[in-house]
Amino acid sequence: MNAELERVLDDLLAVKGVLAAAVVDVGGEVLAAAEREPPGFDSAGGLVAAALSASRVLGGFLGGGLEQAVIEYRGGPVVLTPVPRAPGATDPGEVQVVLTLRLAGLADLGRVRFQLPRLVAQVAAASRRSA
């Protein structure tokens, strides 16, 4: 696992309501994972990649790229946010990793969304340095 990405994810766990976080590549490899409360995403890389792929296809069907996917579960929502390979990239082909978060509840979604641009930039920078 990538030590720099793990540090970013550990910082992310300090955000109120974030229970688990991972950075997963489009092939399903977990590049880094951290959790404050199990279950985390250590062994769920393939599932995250499949959810990302399905969300991208649905976005294409609807005529737009995937910005973010939120899937609600009884155990709390999961947020999938594509991380562009290059700053400002908008082409879905430029997405190589996805930031995946498990939240305590829907009430935490607004707080996390407010901080996502900063978090995505940190993940992107750490991903580029490790590539």
Predicted regions and their residues:
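Non-catalytic interaction/Regulatory regions outside core domains
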Residues: 1-20, 26, 30-131
